[in-house]
Curated annotation (Swiss-Prot):
Organism: Chlamydia trachomatis serovar L2 (strain ATCC VR-902B / DSM 19102 / 434/Bu)
Keywords on record: Isomerase, tRNA processing
Protein name: tRNA pseudouridine synthase B
UniProt similarity note: Belongs to the pseudouridine synthase TruB family. Type 1 subfamily.
Enzyme Commission number(s) from the entry: 5.4.99.25
Function, as annotated: Responsible for synthesis of pseudouridine from uracil-55 in the psi GC loop of transfer RNAs.
Keyword tRNA processing among record annotations: yes
Active site residues according to the UniProt entry: 45 (nucleophile)
InterPro entries linked: PsdUridine_synth_cat_dom_sf, PsdUridine_synth_N, tRNA_psdUridine_synth_TruB, TruB_C
HAMAP family: TruB_bact (MF_01080)
Length: 241
């Protein structure tokens, strides 16, 4: 375990493993470095992987609100023909369809997700309505009226092999990728849920800058060489040999 000193501060870019919660990674980092002042620039669902921006120390946790507003980029897979109550692979199956959309239909529907669109947050989300998170209502079997939100997206179809539709999307803050998968399913008339999600970029930070999140569970792992400033520059560059 590293000694908790004022020098342990900065931005740590982590590739979140599948199956881990975002907060379990934060807890692992707290245990590893002994610094409790740790924030983030956006969480990921347990089934998702990819860029998690961890902010260590008061100087950097103050940047959280700014970084949360930055655009993000995701690679995703929508599973057609099945719908779930959460719009993703962790939910309960609530519908099935035998319809197999054509490529022309897929191209037409995916072209809708360009520029500003109106999106309704899913019931199984942390969005608050009347001071209560939507998923708390959902777990009680309640469906609450939600307001449309305007978000900006740029979706690119990568591959379509039924039942899987692969796409990459750049989006603004507050965009729900599983809602995009759900809406695609509705537009195609077959239903869909989000099967895979990988965050490729958060603001200016990309996946190729990240360390494996499992390293945070290694007691002797030294995070210092991987700490960056707010612009992504390494704070302690490796010495030139």
């Amino acid at each position: 375990m590293e000694l908790a000193t004022e020098s342990i501060e900065g931005v740590l870019l982590v590739d979140k493993p599948q199956g881990r919660t975002s907060f379990s990674l934060i807890r692992s980092l707290v245990r590893l470095i002994g610094v409790k002042k740790i924030g983030h620039a956006g969480t990921l669902d347990p089934f998702a992987t990819g860029v998690m921006v961890m902010l260590i120390g008061r100087k950097f946790t103050r940047l959280s609100d700014i970084m949360l507003f930055e655009d993000k980029e995701y690679a995703a897979v929508a599973h057609l023909g099945t719908t779930t109550d959460t719009y993703d692979c962790d939910g309960k199956i609530v519908g099935r369809s035998k319809k197999v959309p054509t490529m022309d239909e897929v191209l037409t529907c995916t072209s809708y997700f360009q520029g500003e669109i109106q999106q309704v947050p899913p019931m199984f989300s942390a969005k608050k309505v009347q001071g209560k998170k939507l998923y708390e209502y959902a777990r009680q079997g309640l469906s609450i009226e939600r307001r449309f939100a305007t978000v900006t997206v740029n979706l690119r179809l990568v591959k379509y092999e039924y039942p899987r539709l692969h796409f990459v999307v750049q989006c603004s803050k507050g965009t729900y990728i599983r809602s995009i998968a759900h809406e695609l399913g509705n537009m195609l008339g077959c239903g869909a849920y989000l099967e895979e999600l990988r965050r490729l970029r958060s603001g200016s930070f990309s996946i190729d800058q990240c360390i494996d999140g499992n390293l945070l569970d290694e007691p002797e792992f030294n995070v210092s060489p991987y700490l960056r400033d707010a612009n992504g520059l390494i704070l302690q560059p490796a010495p030139v040999l």
